[in-house]
Amino acid sequence: QTMRLRHVVNATGVALHTNLGRAPLADAACTAVQEAASNYTNLEYTLETGARGSRTAAVEELLCVLCGCEAAFVVNNNAAAVLLALAALSRGKGAAVSRGELVEIGDGFRLRDILEESGARVVEVGATNRTHTDDYERAARENDLAVLFKAHTSNFRMVGFTQSVSLRELARIGVRYGLATVADLGGGAPLDEAAYPFSGEPSISRALRDGADIVCFSGDKLLGGPQAGILLGRAELIGRMRLHPLARALRIDKLSLAALEATLRLYCDPARAGNEIPALRMLCTAPETLRARAVYLNKLIEQEGANCATEIISVKRPVGGGCAPSALLDGFAVAVLPAALHVETLEARLRAAAPLPVVARISQGRLLLDTATIRDDECPAVAAAVKAGCVL
């Protein structure tokens, strides 16, 4: 029987497509997963002493070296990281957060609800569109706070008459009032902002330099690794999270740990990371390379003799995963107009294609095959699916 969870071609151009599993893993990470899955491992065993060890020690050491932090901890996703941080640092006390940062994420889940599940009392500060340093200081004076919480509004942008408090300013307030500053970066850029063809996503190291006591982010977004929630920051605070009962409930599994360690090791050489981590490579591929792939795909479709008209067009594509929502990256796509049926019918047939479904999008009456997220080795299967899908 065919597996329900299966390989599909992502022809949408969205590199971090949440519904399609976000970041594909690097070959090194896939090899590490295979090795861990098919064998016993030293997951919680210290080979040097024969004693029990920490399952997350290896990735924590790598994270501290790569990000320049005192300590690190890893759980199963970023929502879990936020939950654990607030449960360990602010249960029964207040956590101040700007009203403009109380976002709703995918599937209808709201940040406020996650914060409240930790046992912290959410103290909203400021107005929806404008929050000032005075708002946080007033909250610190008038409430029994333990945490100043800052959420990066990674899935939307507010423009116009707006004002926000920077992480650096917030951290200074935290020091003044003896409060922990927790920053949820969402995607979390592991490289400096200049390494990406878009702006607006804060780098992890920058957040730590700006004074955040705790920084958390996802493993399967800009990092390009497996699903994971990564916590970095002050050793004393990380230690409290590590010993919290929720840490057991939220712990990361061995296969994700294997993939995460392999991914982090690639970042020891940023150039290698850019070449070998698929999500990073797709986001940074030059438009001329994408055009060449579109030419190749278009030629294959023509050679198949598909009953359709095709054209290579320039397109704009989002990053995905709630990252850089205002950024649209340059790319190229093959636009397909079937000759004998509706384009919606072709789109549905591609989704049902066997053995390899193709997920594309429709724009201005044509089906677009965006080459930013189609691998070269997938192009023949895409061309064959287009031919089969255009048959009346």
Regions from the PLM with identified roles:
Residues 287, 291-375:
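Conserved C-terminal alpha-helix-loop-beta "cap" of PLP-dependent enzymes
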Residues 9-13, 223-226, 329, 361-367:
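Short Gly/Ser/Thr- and Asp/Glu-enriched loop/turn motifs at secondary-structure junctions
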Residues 236, 244-245, 252-301, 305, ...:
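Structural motif of enzymes handling amino- and sulfur-group chemistry
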